[in-house]
Amino acid sequence: MASIVEKETGVPDERRTVAAVFVNRMREGMRLQTDPTVIYGVTGGKEVLDRGLRRSELNRKTPYNTYQIDGLPPTPIANPGRAAIEAALAPDESPYLYFVADGSGGHAFARTLAEHEANVARWREIERAQGADTESPVQTD
């Protein structure tokens, strides 16, 4: 869990909230659906993916594809720092189940799928305004 938190956010104040989202999803029986685990499976952890994930990659069943598997991947996907480990051990008490990039380097968190979809739409607008060319599907992390 800590390695996923490490890869999901570099914003110190978000780590415990990101960890809470993953704990909440597991408690609800939801899949983690987090892009960094898919990227690890695609690259074997050997390189950075300098593009958005393709739908075919999200649909490919690998032990690290948390869109396709239940629970955590079989191994860490990174070497987590102390702050990510602490966040995983003591996540926030939070109602959130979703998050998406907010355009500032951080994330917008949501309790419901409807809230999340609105946040994703805002992120897509930011991407369009910045001229981003991605093939990334709607993120649910």
Where are these regions (language model features)?
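Bacterial extracytoplasmic/cell-wall-associated proteins, especially those involved in peptidoglycan
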Residues: 1-141
